Amino acid sequence: MTGIALYAPAPPRPALVASPGRVVLDGTTKALVHVAAPRGHQVIDVSLAPYALDLRGRPRLGGGAHAPRWVSARPLHLRVGPAGAVVTLAAAPPRGAVPGDRPFALVLTTRGVRGKSVAVRLRIGVLVIAHVRGKVVRRLVIGPVVARSGRLVELTIRNTGNAVERLARGRLVLTLLRRGRVVVRLHPPPRELLPRSRAVIVTRLPRSLHGPATVRVSLGSFVHRYPLRL
């Protein structure tokens, strides 16, 4: 009897990595981001760019506010290899700066290799939140709730405060009721809402339902019922 061992190929090493993937600059402070190129040496251009989340929570560069002028990244160009190098972020908010969180991205872009007919450039981003100390305003506007195709329930939430809001799993609960009885409880996946942004939370019912119903939305001390037609 002959045995054959099957080995899955190792996943390819990424061409460019950065750690940590999220940085908080609290007041006047500095933070270090380690950048490495596991596949070989790369020349990297460093910049700061607007950062936003779309309605479904997917990150994108652009569309948000620019990085504050009092935040800097150094160096602006560096050569990195497998051992890596460090980019230093520094924040120095001026006196009178408006309190709150300011999200943006540290963008790392590889340069194309000279002599190749097609120059491939790789770009990755690190989320940076510059926090100005002072009065923190936490304000979420919840609703409306809309049904789609009998199985999808969409909840809109707006963050009108000045701080990033993180909705951990279990913090937000949607309970579907019919004739006062609980049909199902929905626990949306974790989400993050940037200041002055809007999010659409989509949850799927375990089965197709039709007719009138009520959705009870619970988020911390907030509890409200919304009529719904499936």
Where are these regions (language model features)?
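Beta-sheet-dominated interaction scaffolds and their linkers
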Residues: 6-40, 139-154
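Surface-exposed binding patches on compact interaction domains or structured appendages
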Residues: 11-20, 39-88, 168-183
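Short, solvent-exposed loop/turn segments enriched in Ser/Thr/Gly
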Residues: 26-32, 84-87, 97-105, 149-153
